[in-house]
């Protein structure tokens, strides 16, 4: 499940909202493209962020002709880019908080 979003939709409702069949959501889960939360009774629950991800997957597959392996790679690249942006933002805020410190001393990898 995507972080920061509360899971509320059972698979039939989620599929209807995303414009696909419930089996499609199961396939996306099997392929590791979505990860819905499961209840104690093993019912899948989808969040709004999960549904947004499904819409992205459907756009890439149906409109752009990308296969599921390609979609998985693109989503991983998107997540990596988001992480890199967070790191860059953190470095920028560190730079602003200590402007007198030389940059080569602040960033040691």
Positions of the model-derived regions?
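Short coil turns linking two alpha-helices in DNA-binding domains
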Residues: 21-23
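Arg/Lys-rich, alpha-helical DNA-contact motif
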Residues: 1-16, 30, 35-41, 48-109
